[in-house]
Amino acid sequence: MDFDPTGIHGREHVCRALIFGKALAGIYKRAGFEVDEYALYRAIAFHDSGRRSNGADMDEDKSAAKLRSYLRGEGAVDAYRDAAAGLITHGQAGQQTVEGMILQSADSLDIIRVRGLEGFNTRFLSFMQKTAVKGDAALPSDPALLRKLLEEVSRFIQMTSPPPEEVMPLDDESPEAFRARRDAATEALKARNGAIPSEGYFEERFESVLIAHKEQFPLLYENYMR
């Protein structure tokens, strides 16, 4: 993700997707589903690793190849590597596994950062949709739980991403002025992120927020820690 190290599909997005993915996995496990968490979390971590631009993801195969290479180094057999990589390449079509549905939903939840809670369309999510997984099983619809999840996700995004005014155009702002301000904010974000070594980035910037403010994220926290 050299093209976008901190932005829409950079490591901030991936870290939030990991938080959301682990919480969703906890919800599924509470409902009696089995979840291959090893494959799921690594697929989330790699799902945008092959991207060369923002917008529609045209590089899923490259991201999947990076995951296959990583799992090969971990000693995983071919069939397992292919299944894990398939969570990336098939995540937008079918969601035929629990893990695929979780990945797609965890990725999509971060769209709230761009569209806002009220502008987010839940049809982006395979979570709680009537999609068959592992036979005819599907997570029952629970509008109240889904709304609570979205509210907590929105709050978490607000606490772990740049303020909207840093990345959105202001009223009557010229395109040139906006680009200059956006570029300055991006450089500041890179400098901030670079202050923490990569090995502590996730825990320091994201997991610690969830734990320190768990009273604001009861649903996310309870299922993340499950």
Regions found by a protein language model. Give the residues of each.
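Divalent metal-dependent phosphate-bond-processing catalytic cores, especially two-metal-ion Mg2+/Mn2+ enzymes
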Residues: F3-F33, F46, A93-R226
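Short, conserved micro-motifs enriched in small and acidic residues
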Residues: R11, D57-M58
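An active-site-proximal "capping" alpha-helix that borders the catalytic cofactor pocket
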Residues: R16-L24, M58-G73
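Inter-helical turn/loop segments and adjacent helix faces that build the functional surface
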Residues: A31-G32, L71-D78
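His-Asp-centered metal-binding catalytic motifs of divalent-metal-dependent phosphohydrolases/nucleases
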Residues: V35-G55, S63, A84-A93
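Short helix-to-loop capping/linker segments positioned immediately adjacent to catalytic or ligand/cofactor-binding
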Residues: N54, G73-A76, A93-Q96
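Short, function-defining helix-loop hinge/capping sites that tune catalysis or transport
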Residues: G55-A56, R115
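Membrane-interface starts of transmembrane alpha-helices
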Residues: V77-A85
